From Swiss-Prot:
One of its GO terms (cellular component) is membrane. It is a single-pass membrane protein. The keyword Coiled coil applies. Residues 1-31 form a coiled coil. The keyword Transmembrane helix applies. Keywords: Coiled coil, Membrane, Transmembrane, Transmembrane helix. The chain crosses the membrane at residues 31-51. Belongs to the SMCO4 family. InterPro entries: DUF4519. This is Single-pass membrane and coiled-coil domain-containing protein 4 homolog. It is found in: Membrane.
Amino acid sequence: MRQLKGKVKETRKQKKERKLDNLETQAKIRTVVLPALGVLAVFLVLFVYLKTRPAVLA
């Protein structure tokens, strides 16, 4: 028989595993990536604030 072009049909088990993997990936994004971006944003705001504040005359 000839080999048909295109992707192989996904079974129910494979589809369920893929969906579970996607859920795990989304959970990791929420617990790792978003806090890291938050920290970077805080450092950026702090850096800009410190560089643009007026000099204190003593």
